[in-house]
């Protein structure tokens, strides 16, 4: 069973790597990597896999590759 989650990404953050859940349930992921050559996306996948306790291979970017709001399939 897989879930799709919407994530707001903050690349180049000194605060990361960190996952915060807002009052509306939206996830915000802070990563240190800049949004260059897919490095921030790879970092977000790594952070989400750790957050949800699944292997990185089970986290897939399904939408928003070049946007700050992205959709990921987990599981």
Curated annotation (Swiss-Prot):
Xref: Gene3D superfamilies: YggU-like
InterPro entries: DUF167, YggU-like_sf
A Pfam family: DUF167
Family: Belongs to the UPF0235 family.
Protein name as annotated: UPF0235 protein Mvan_2846
Organism: Mycolicibacterium vanbaalenii (strain DSM 7251 / JCM 13017 / BCRC 16820 / KCTC 9966 / NRRL B-24157 / PYR-1) (Mycobacterium vanbaalenii)
